[in-house]
Amino acid sequence: MTLAEYEWMRNQLDEPIKLKKKRLMLDRVQEDSFDPYKEISNNRRHFKKTEDLYYLVLNLHMVEKTEVSETEFEFLRYECRIIEEYLMQIPDYGQFELSILADFPWIFSDRFIENNYLKIKKRMRRLAQLNNHEQYLFTFLINLTSFYIENGRLKKARSVNEDMKRSLAHKERSTVIYETLMADYYQRLISAALGEEKTKDYQEFFTVLEYMLGKNQRRSLEKKLLAIAEPSN
């Protein structure tokens, strides 16, 4: 048994308990009596007591769920710093670490992403080979692309988007329909933001997207593209 195989089986035992705790916390986020700052404080206290990074990751999930403002997000710089320092110290990434990178690439410094980009992709591919978890690499790339777009860093967004499309190119197209659609969508979004193409040229694409993903998903994605492209049109 390899270390990676042992790690995967161990995670199958530990993860359900943690997933349940996360689900219960995210359910409580919707309650009027929920106090996010108290929850953050409690989770930090648990982290200092157990040294389990999971409690800091809970805070990231909670903040993402509540859609706090950028000012409020500054309150979580502690979590971002501790998590990045932890990932810089360990020699390899397991499933837990890769899930953090996939879900929250935007919490890391540019230097960390640039220095570890190839390592992250390589480890995610290894994980996919071990237990067919293909979604880690795609989620990481699409979230990183989205983050760069939202911050106006379109050259970086295009570079990651092209990387995403290359990673899908060798796969059977029928097995990655959603992934291919989203990679194409972000390619078009970047082009629109750069003023390279007009949004009216995308109607055929959105018709296909609606057919595959439904009207609600089409409306949401089309609205996002129009909002980003509007200043350049």
PLM regions: where:
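Helix-turn-helix repeat elements of alpha-solenoid scaffolds
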Residues: 28-42, 70-81, 110-122, 154-164, ...
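Amphipathic alpha-helical segments of tetratricopeptide repeats
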Residues: 41-45, 81-88, 121-128, 162-173, ...
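C-terminal non-catalytic interaction modules
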Residues: 189-233
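Residue at a conserved register position within TPR or TPR-like alpha-solenoid repeats
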Residues: 104, 141, 148, 191-193
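Basic, Lys/Arg-rich alpha-helical nucleic-acid-recognition elements, primarily the DNA-binding modules
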Residues: 1-20
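Helix-turn-helix/homeodomain-like alpha-helical modules used for DNA recognition
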Residues: 15-70, 79-80
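Residue signature of alpha-solenoid helical repeat architecture, marking inter-repeat boundaries
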Residues: 49-56, 91-96, 135, 175-178
